Each structure stands twice: as structure tokens, then as C-alpha cells.
């Protein structure tokens, strides 16, 4: 049984979306059980409309719901112990749940997750990893918003975390890893990126294959299994890709309905267009995994509908089922066992 804690109050639509989506997950994942945290006055009317959900879930009333516009510091101070977001994360810490899912405020969710779960040994900052549809299938891109700016060591940490996720999710023994840069030549890019590349080459880990630098168009090509960058550029890339997918879908809809001949052509090519639409549907890959913590947390888009939130819940399910935490710890242990230790008395230039 996979136990999944749910922040029912998160997102733009709250229980009206988060709760019905769980029935979709239950149908596809019969060994899932849900620990639901939310305000009784808002969640109960929805639960009463979904009697089948009672068989696979337990509900806990929480007095506070973190708002989407709350600052992380406010969310931590203002009754965090009573909030549905905190309680859902705490269930993972206490061993009552295997993974936490929330569509709530990203900054608050990350702050609470770090405070409650803590980071793994030698990981300074967690990263948010997203699944990215590519020409070759799917890849992982991180960080997409947790860390604005990153030094070389943090980029190396992200590479290790991303490789562990690719190993767990895609069952790839040695995922290929690339550092996002303005060019593939070793002389290009910021010093932090170039130094991270040198460190990854020298580490020569058996758990990954360091490919080198990759450019923005390599993400969609699927040149590597894992693309590593800092959160500012990663978030812009993610939002740009999602917006472009919606833009192309809208162009296709307009083109297919413009003339009678276009509508007739669509009838004959309906299956192909349906496959394209499914491939470009951002709901299918909804969910960012918080990597580097001592527990698993998945962030859904705040605007997700039922199918989108269900995809985030199923992503969390897969992360538990595939042994993400154990594989991450093993990869980190291997790296730090090989990492050079500074001589006693050495002075850092940092």
C-alpha cells in the first residue's frame, strides 16, 4: 500500500479539484490510500458527494489554509502547525504517509518542506524537478524554481539528484546528464557552470554519464536524460515551453476550423491530431518533485484541473514505488566517497 498525504486546500480551486481527482487515481492505482488534510467546512460538502472516496481515504480537519499569495515567511509564522499544508508534510515526516502532494503556494510549500523534513546530508539546497516531453520520450529538468542562482557544487548536487530520479522513474541504469549553457563549447558560459562541468567529469560516477553542456533546444530534442540548471532559467524555460504548447494547440484548432476543406481534412487525420494533442497536453506531465529532502513532496500546478492534479498524485506514487529516496542516498554516498577531501589546515578561497 502506498500512503499519500493530500493538502486538499492547495491550488486555485481547492477541494473542488483536489478531492475528485483522487477517485481517478484510486481507479488506476488500487493500492493507493489517501490521508486528506483540509478545512471541514470546505472539504466536507465535496467528500459527501464522493462516497466512494471514503473507502480509500481518511480526513483530518485543519483550521488554516495557506493562501496562494502568502509569503513563505508568513506561512511559516502564521499558524503553520494548524495548516493543511503543514499537516500533509508532517505526515511524511512522522512516517504516516510515503509522499505529500500539494497544489498550494510554491514558496510556502518549499519552506515548510525544508523546515519539516530537512535536507539530505551534504545537500545545501533542494531542487524542483519537472518531467519534460521530448522527441525521444521524456527527460527530467531541474531546477525549475527552487533556487535562484546556484554555485558549482549546488549544480553538481542537482545533477546527482536528477540522475537518481531518472534511474528511479525511467529505469535507466546510467542516465545521461547535461548542464544547460549558452553553448556546448567548454570555454562558454558562467564560471559556476564551467566549474560544475569540471567537477562532474572528475567524479566519473557509475550512476550517471556526464554528457557535457547542452543548449536550450537540446531539452526538447531529448539529447540527454537529465538537464541541469539553476532555478531562474529553469523556471523561465518551463513556463515558456508550457505556453508554447498551448499556443500551438490553439493555432491547430483555429486552422482546422477555418474552412470546410480544413474540417474535412481534420476528419481524416483525427487520430494523428489526437496523438499530437495528448503529447502536448501539459496536464499529462503536471507535477514538480522536490529533490534533496528526507521525504518526497510533489508540487502540482495551482491551476491544475482534476486530470492534472491526478497526474501529480500519480507521479508521487511512482516516486515511492520506484524507491527514489534509497536510490538518491546511494548516489550521494558514492559521490561523497569519491569527493576529494581538503588537507588539514587548508584555507578556503571561497
UniProtKB/Swiss-Prot annotation:
SUPFAM superfamilies associated with the record: Isocitrate/Isopropylmalate dehydrogenase-like
Subcellular location as annotated: Cytoplasm
UniProt xrefs under InterPro entries: FA_synthesis, Phospholipid_synth_PlsX-like
Keywords, ordered alphabetically: Cytoplasm, Lipid biosynthesis, Lipid metabolism, Phospholipid biosynthesis, Phospholipid metabolism, Transferase
First-level EC class: transferase
MF GO annotations: phosphate:acyl-[acyl carrier protein] acyltransferase activity
Ranges in coiled-coil conformation: none
One Gene Ontology term, aspect cellular component: cytoplasm
Biological-process GO terms, alphabetical: fatty acid biosynthetic process; phospholipid biosynthetic process
Domain of life (superkingdom): Bacteria
Function recorded in the entry: Catalyzes the reversible formation of acyl-phosphate (acyl-PO(4)) from acyl-[acyl-carrier-protein] (acyl-ACP). This enzyme utilizes acyl-ACP as fatty acyl donor, but not acyl-CoA.
Protein name: Phosphate acyltransferase
